[in-house]
């Protein structure tokens, strides 16, 4: 018997027949003579709008049972942990969860500004013995093919899964068993969410790990007569961004104007709702550091929550429930120091709280948390101490090093002996001059 994904029925337990929940589809006389190696292959399917790519890319003339996985970050590998990767579907037992993900290289299109934009690839799943590589054995090294199987599946035999008829069977949204680690930089079509980060895992040499790509999006949701291409949504989004003067592939640059807008937007929020970042620093949000606000120093004051070390500290932050029910709260009315005196005065209250966050050395990242806390608690005291240190004496211009006590004497205008006020002994000439000054003045009437 063969299994049909997405169809529920009673299961039959037998050593010769695989059990499952799918509707049993018994093969007719012509199907029974089909060779095992060719099971699941179409002879030559009719090309439709959903299987043709007008501007480059490889054609996928086979219909997958599941929606695709799309790459949205360049340079990310498409890979799964050993024993994971096959999507789940009602009616298919774990023993049939084996096959491969096929990379569909999509083409490029012209944007409104005349540039060619390459669409990132997409991956689609095919059961073992079906799809474009139905003849290939499990584990064969093929570019654009990534083999996956559950731990209960026998990879030496093809999966007993019927082909999908897009006119009667819709594509099933891709879902995985709990605990599956999805590739980083990819998202499941139709889910609207990016896939969780993947763990790096060693693969056997028979499993080829290739660059991520994607196949046709929701191929089963479109009939063969549909004129809508699977990449039309991406093209429309890119055209809209091009009209707005934005490039979806380039990160948006933050200018002084946008930084000012971001800062003002943050400052317009209540104090307890602000999140400091590069555009709005900790001091701008909450004021200078001091005894009452004693956390933060160095780069963390500049970057705020954008600091790479902040996320691990955020794990210690209490929840709203812990804040209200695990703290000592006190409501106090305070003086309104802000606002225009001409405007009606508002009553201002403070909800003061006192609590504690308890953790021990078994906490994940304990050493890093302690390091960050020690670096930022009361860091303002060290900064204030550095600012209060006496500045290094600067050498005046026009002097050479090593002049010592003469460095404080100006050389622009030399001082006279009177200005210098230097003491010296009187000479005989000085004494004679002083005596003449003491004699009475007499007018000289002698003729020349």
From Swiss-Prot:
List the GO molecular function terms: RNA binding
Residue intervals of the CoV N NTD domain: 61-190
Q: Which residues form a coiled coil?
A: none
**Polar residues bias spans:** 29-38, 45-55
Q: Which locations, inside or outside the cell, does it occupy?
A: Virion; Host endoplasmic reticulum-Golgi intermediate compartment; Host Golgi apparatus
Binding locations of RNA? 106, 122, 164
Q: Which residues carry this modification: Phosphothreonine?
A: 174, 427
Low complexity composition bias: residue spans: 9-22, 193-223
Q: Region Disordered: which residues? A: 1-55, 158-231, 266-293, 385-448
Query: CoV N CTD domain location, by residue?
Result: 259-384
In the record, the effect of residue 33 to F is given as: In strain: Isolate ATCC VR-759 and Isolate clinical OC43-Paris
| Record note on what altering residue 107 to R does | In strain: Isolate ATCC VR-759 and Isolate clinical OC43-Paris
InterPro entries from the xrefs?
A: N_prot_C_CoV, N_prot_N_CoV, NCAP_bCoV, Nucleocap_CoV, Nucleocapsid_C, Nucleocapsid_N
Bias-annotated ranges (Basic residues): 266-276
Residues recorded as bearing Phosphoserine in the entry: 167, 191, 390, 423
Region span, RNA-binding: 52-194
Write out the similarity annotation.
Belongs to the betacoronavirus nucleocapsid protein family.
This molecule's function is given as: Packages the positive strand viral genome RNA into a helical ribonucleocapsid (RNP) and plays a fundamental role during virion assembly through its interactions with the viral genome and membrane protein M. Plays an important role in enhancing the efficiency of subgenomic viral RNA transcription as well as viral replication. Attenuates the stress granules formation by reducing host G3BP1 access to host mRNAs under stress conditions.
Q: How does it assemble?
A: Homooligomer. Both monomeric and oligomeric forms interact with RNA. Interacts with protein M. Interacts with NSP3; this interaction serves to tether the genome to the newly translated replicase-transcriptase complex at a very early stage of infection.
Q: What is this protein called?
A: Nucleoprotein
Organism, scientific name: Human coronavirus OC43 (HCoV-OC43)
């Amino acid at each position: 018997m063969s299994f049909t994904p997405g169809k529920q029925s009673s299961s039959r337990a037998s050593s010769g027949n695989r059990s499952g929940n799918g509707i049993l589809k018994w093969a007719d006389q012509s199907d029974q003579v089909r060779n095992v190696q060719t099971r699941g292959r179409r002879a030559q399917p009719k090309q439709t709008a959903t299987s043709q790519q007008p501007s480059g890319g490889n054609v996928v003339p086979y219909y997958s049972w599941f929606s695709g996985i799309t790459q949205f970050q360049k340079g990310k590998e498409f890979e799964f942990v050993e024993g994971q990767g096959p999507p789940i579907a009602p009616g298919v037992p774990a023993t049939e969860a084996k096959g491969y993900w096929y990379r569909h290289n999509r083409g490029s299109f012209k944007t409104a500004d005349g540039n060619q934009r390459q669409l990132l690839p997409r991956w689609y799943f095919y059961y073992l013995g079906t799809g474009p590589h139905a003849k290939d054995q499990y584990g064969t090294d093929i570019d654009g093919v990534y083999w996956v199987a559950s731990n209960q599946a026998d990879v030496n035999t093809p999966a007993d899964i019927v082909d999908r008829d897009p006119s009667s069977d819709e594509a099933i949204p891709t879902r995985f068993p709990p605990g599956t680690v999805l590739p980083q930089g990819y998202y499941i079509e139709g889910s609207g969410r990016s896939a969780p980060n993947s763990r790096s895992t060693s693969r056997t040499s028979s499993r080829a790990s290739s660059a991520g790509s994607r196949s046709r999006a929701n191929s089963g949701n479109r009939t063969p007569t549909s004129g809508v291409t699977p990449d039309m949504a991406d093209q429309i989004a890119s055209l809209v961004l091009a009209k707005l003067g934005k490039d979806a592939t380039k990160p948006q640059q933050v200018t002084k104007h946008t930084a000012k807008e971001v800062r003002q937007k943050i400052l317009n929020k209540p104090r307890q709702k602000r999140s400091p970042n590069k555009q709005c620093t900790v001091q701008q949000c909450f004021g200078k550091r001091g005894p009452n606000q004693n956390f933060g120093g160095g780069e963390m004051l500049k970057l705020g929550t954008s600091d790479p070390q902040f996320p691990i500290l955020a794990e210690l932050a209490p929840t709203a429930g812990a804040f209200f029910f695990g703290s000592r709260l006190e409501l106090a009315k305070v003086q309104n120091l802000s606002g225009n005196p001409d405007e009606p005065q508002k009553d201002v209250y403070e909800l003061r709280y006192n609590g504690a966050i308890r953790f021990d050395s078994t906490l994940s990242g304990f050493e890093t948390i302690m390091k960050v806390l020690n670096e930022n608690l009361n860091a303002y005291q060290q900064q204030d101490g550095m600012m209060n240190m006496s500045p290094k004496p600067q050498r005046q211009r026009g002097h050479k090093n090593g002049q010592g006590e003469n460095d404080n004497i100006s050389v622009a205008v030399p001082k006279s002996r009177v200005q210098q006020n230097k003491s010296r002994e009187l000479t005989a000439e000085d004494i004679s001059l002083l005596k003449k000054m003491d004699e009475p003045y007499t007018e000289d009437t002698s003729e020349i």
